[in-house]
Amino acid sequence: MSEDNFDEEFDGTLPSGPRHPMARRFRGYLPVVVDVETGGFNSATDALLEIAATTVGMDEKGFLFPEHTYFFRIEPFEGANIEPAALEFTGIKLDHPLRMAVQEEQALTEIFRGIRKALKANGCKRAILVGHNSSFDLGFLNAAVARTGIKRNPFHPFSSFDTATLAGLAYGQTVLAKACQAAGMEFDNREAHSARYDTEKTAELFCGIVNRWKEMGGWMDDDD
């Protein structure tokens, strides 16, 4: 991904005048959906193998929609543990000639740059991670940030929106595939456990739940 895709950096200054509706919706936080595929369950010792992030936009009526997805395959950090069972579960083949993996720092730098652009466009001050069992994804993200020494992390360090919880409330389902099906979405189990696919499905699920709540009168913009 070329830096030409991003025309300017967010300097932390919010625009003057009326705030964008997205900034009002979540107290200045921009939802960004993240999924990681890993070499195990321990964020301190196990490899980060894939990461995807989908930014969320808002239309003129205040409804959310998945906007742009960033996706990278990651080279395991030096000394990383990789459990064979994890590779079997995800189907990731580390030696595949077309894997085209990059270092953690490059992936995070480019994802964060795109998120900062989205923050500025939406008048938001910080990103908040959305994930299915979000503490897992946030834990691996924070561990990778610490390993690489990246200073400009746009995400809140511990707050998140968990779609497993939201889907349990909305549909009585906590498994991603079953929650998507309950929401009337298509879900291909053959594509599951790819960070890109799971992120985009989680983003669709999150937007659907939030939009359904709005339709029921659960959140009204100041202009509604």
UniProtKB/Swiss-Prot annotation:
SMART domains: EXOIII. Residues 32-206 form the Exonuclease domain. One of its GO terms (cellular component) is cytosol. It comes from the Bacteria. GO terms for molecular function: 3'-5' exonuclease activity; magnesium ion binding; nucleic acid binding; RNA exonuclease activity, producing 5'-phosphomonoesters. Mg(2+) 2 binds at D35, E37, H193, D198. One of its GO terms (biological process) is DNA replication proofreading. Keywords: Exonuclease, Hydrolase, Magnesium, Metal-binding, Nuclease, tRNA processing. Mg(2+) 1 binds at D35. Gene3D superfamilies: Ribonuclease H-like superfamily/Ribonuclease H (3.30.420.10). Its EC number is 3.1.13.-. The record marks F41, F89, F136, F158 as: Important for substrate binding and specificity. The active site is at H193 (proton donor/acceptor). Binds two Mg(2+) per subunit. The active form of the enzyme binds two Mg(2+) ions in its active site. The first Mg(2+) forms only one salt bridge with the protein. It is an enzyme of class 3 (hydrolase). Its cofactor is Mg(2+). NCBIfam families: RNaseT. Trims short 3' overhangs of a variety of RNA species, leaving a one or two nucleotide 3' overhang. Responsible for the end-turnover of tRNA: specifically removes the terminal AMP residue from uncharged tRNA (tRNA-C-C-A). Also appears to be involved in tRNA biosynthesis. Belongs to the RNase T family. Homodimer. This is Ribonuclease T.
